[in-house]
C-alpha cells in the first residue's frame, strides 16, 4: 500500500467518524455545521472530503478532516442551542489564536449558544402558492431542514395548486422527487392521495386545490399566522397579492418576482434590514437582481460606481417556446433550444430599489441561451476611484466571499476550467469568475455566474427567515 493510498484511507475513516457526529448535532441541537457556506449535514464521505479540499481555494490550503473531527467532538460536549457554525473559519480562528485548549476556547467563542440545548426557536408556518420550478426548489430547501426539529424554524405546511387530472398529486410528488437539472430529492417521498398529502422525510405537506386565492380558508387545515410565498408571478402588485393576505390563516406574503409600485423589493444581504413588522407584502426581486446587486454593492462601497451596463446571458425559462410558436413578447416566440434570443430585462433598473444610490446609473439587456439553468451577468462599470488592477479587484471579492457581510451572497471562483454546469446548486446569489475580470483605468468588467433557480431560491428562503423572525446565531462572529 502506497503512502498516498494509506493517507486517503485515513481521511476516509476520519470522514466516516464525522458523519454521525454532524448528524447528531443537527438533529438534537439544531446545529448546522458548514464549510464556507456549504453545509456538512447529510453529506457522504466523499462529499465531506471534497468540501475539505475546497477550502484551499479560499484559504490557500485544504482543511484537514482530523482537525474538523477534533473540533466537532469538542462542540458535541457543549450542549449547544440552535446555531450555524463555519468549521473552516472556526479552525482558522483557533489556529491564529495559538491553538489553545478547545474546552476553554470554544465556550468563549460560542458563549450565547453554550448550554442551550433544547431551546425551541420560533416556529413559522409556510404555504407555497404554486409548485413550479421555484416552488419545488423552495420545498426541497425547507424539507431538507426538517430532520432537525430544533433548527427548522420554517415549517412547510401546504402547497396551493390547480388540479390537473386524477393523478395530479402523484405527478407532483414525482416532480419533487426527480429533477433533470438538480438531481434527485435527498430523502424519501410518500403519497397519501386520500388526504391530498405528500409526506417528505416524514413531514406531511397538504396540497390544497384551488384556482382562486379568495376561496381558501387555511385555518381549516390547521394553518395559522402563515407566511405565504406566491411563486406563480401571476400577481405582482399589492392589490393582487392582498387576495392572499385577506384569507384566514395568512399573515404575510412574499412574492418571488419583481414587485410593482411601492412594494419593497428585497435583495437579502443588501437591504433586508428595511423589512419591518408592518410590511405585510414584500418582493424578493428577481434572480438576476439578486445576482448582480451584491457584487455592485461591493464595487460601490470600495470604489464608487459612476455608471454601468449589465448584460445577462440567461438560461431559457418556461416562458419561452420549445419550438417556434406565437409569443406576445418580441423574439421570445422563437425556439429556446435552438437560438440565442435577445430580450429585455428590468434587472439593472431594479437594482436601485435595493441600492438607491445607483438609480439612473445602470442599463441592461439580456440574451437567452439554450441551457436550462445557470446564467451569467457581465457588469461593465465606470468607477469613481480606479481599482488599480484586476488582482486588487479580485482580492476584494475573494475576501468578501470568505468573511464579508455579503459572504452568503457573493461567491468566488478561480478555476480556469469552470463552466456553467459547475455552478448548478450554488447557494450564493452569484459567483465572481475572477479569471475573467478586466480592469482598465477607471473601468472594470466583472463576470458573475448565478444559478438562477437554486441560488435565487436560497435568497428567497433567507428573506422568509427574516420575515418570520427566525434568526439563529452564526459563528465565528464577525
Where are these regions (language model features)?
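C-terminal substrate-binding/catalytic lobe of Rossmann-fold NAD(P)-dependent dehydrogenases
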Residues: 2-49, 302-442
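N-terminal Rossmann-like NAD(P) cofactor-binding subdomain of oxidoreductases
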Residues: 2-321, 329, 462-463, 470, ...
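C-terminal active-site/capping subdomain that shapes the small-molecule cofactor and substrate pocket
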Residues: 46-118, 364, 380-478
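Conserved active-site and cofactor/substrate-binding residues in soluble primary-metabolism enzymes
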Residues: 63-66, 129, 133, 223, ...
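Short glycine-rich or small-residue beta-strand-to-loop segments that form or flank ligand, phosphate
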Residues: 123-130, 281-283, 377-384, 444-450
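Residue-level marker of positions within ordered structural domains that often coincide
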Residues: 139, 233, 249, 258, ...
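Glycine-centered flexibility motif
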Residues: 170, 174, 181-184, 233, ...
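Generic structural signal for residues in well-ordered beta-strands
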Residues: 205-207, 362, 446
Amino acid at each position: 500500500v502506497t503512502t498516498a493510498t494509506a493517507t486517503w484511507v485515513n481521511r476516509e475513516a476520519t470522514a466516516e467518524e464525522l458523519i454521525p457526529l454532524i448528524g447528531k448535532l443537527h438533529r438534537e441541537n439544531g446545529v448546522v455545521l458548514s464549510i464556507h457556506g456549504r453545509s456538512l449535514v447529510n453529506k457522504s464521505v466523499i462529499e465531506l472530503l471534497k468540501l475539505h479540499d475546497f477550502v484551499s481555494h479560499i484559504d490557500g490550503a485544504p482543511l484537514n478532516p482530523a482537525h474538523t473531527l477534533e473540533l466537532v467532538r469538542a462542540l458535541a460536549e457543549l450542549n449547544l442551542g440552535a446555531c450555524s457554525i463555519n468549521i473552516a473559519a472556526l479552525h482558522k480562528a483557533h489556529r491564529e489564536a495559538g491553538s489553545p485548549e478547545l474546552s476553554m476556547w470554544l465556550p468563549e467563542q460560542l458563549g450565547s449558544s453554550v448550554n442551550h440545548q433544547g431551546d425551541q426557536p420560533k416556529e413559522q408556518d409556510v404555504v407555497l402558492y404554486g409548485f413550479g420550478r421555484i416552488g419545488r426548489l423552495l420545498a426541497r430547501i425547507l424539507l431538507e431542514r426538517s430532520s432537525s426539529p430544533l433548527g427548522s424554524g420554517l415549517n412547510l405546511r401546504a402547497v396551493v395548486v390547480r388540479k390537473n387530472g386524477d393523478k395530479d398529486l402523484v405527478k407532483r410528488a414525482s416532480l419533487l422527487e426527480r429533477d433533470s437539472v438538480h438531481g434527485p430529492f435527498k430523502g424519501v417521498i410518500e403519497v397519501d392521495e386520500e388526504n391530498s398529502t405528500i409526506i417528505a422525510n416524514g413531514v406531511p405537506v397538504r396540497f390544497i386545490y384551488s384556482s382562486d386565492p379568495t376561496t381558501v380558508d387555511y385555518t381549516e387545515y390547521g394553518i395559522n399566522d402563515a407566511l405565504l410565498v406566491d411563486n406563480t408571478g401571476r400577481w405582482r402588485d399589492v392589490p393582487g397579492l392582498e387576495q392572499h393576505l385577506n384569507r384566514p390563516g395568512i399573515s404575510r406574503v412574499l412574492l418571488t418576482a419583481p414587485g410593482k409600485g411601492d412594494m419593497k423589493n428585497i435583495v437579502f444581504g443588501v437591504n433586508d434590514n428595511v423589512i419591518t413588522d408592518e410590511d405585510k407584502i414584500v418582493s424578493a426581486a428577481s434572480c438576476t437582481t439578486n445576482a448582480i446587486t451584491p457584487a455592485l454593492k461591493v464595487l460601490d462601497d470600495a470604489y464608487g460606481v459612476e455608471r454601468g451596463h449589465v448584460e445577462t446571458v440567461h438560461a431559457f425559462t418556461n416562458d419561452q417556446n420549445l419550438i417556434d410558436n406565437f409569443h406576445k413578447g418580441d423574439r421570445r416566440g422563437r425556439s429556446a433550444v435552438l437560438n440565442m434570443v435577445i430580450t429585455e430585462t428590468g434587472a439593472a433598473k431594479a437594482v436601485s430599489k435595493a441600492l438607491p444610490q445607483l438609480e439612473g446609473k445602470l442599463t441592461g439587456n439580456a440574451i437567452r441561451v439554450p441551457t436550462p439553468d445557470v446564467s451569467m451577468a457581465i457588469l461593465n462599470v465606470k468607477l469613481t476611484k480606479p481599482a488599480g488592477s484586476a488582482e486588487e479587484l479580485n482580492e476584494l471579492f475573494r475576501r468578501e466571499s470568505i468573511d464579508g457581510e455579503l459572504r452568503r451572497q457573493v461567491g468566488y471562483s478561480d478555476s480556469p476550467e469552470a463552466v456553467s454546469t459547475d455552478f448548478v446548486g450554488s447557494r450564493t446569489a452569484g459567483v465572481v469568475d475572477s479569471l475573467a475580470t478586466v480592469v482598465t483605468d477607471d473601468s472594470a468588467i466583472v463576470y458573475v455566474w448565478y444559478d438562477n433557480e437554486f441560488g435565487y431560491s436560497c435568497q428567497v428562503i433567507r428573506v422568509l427567515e427574516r420575515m418570520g423572525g427566525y434568526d439563529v446565531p452564526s459563528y465565528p462572529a464577525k
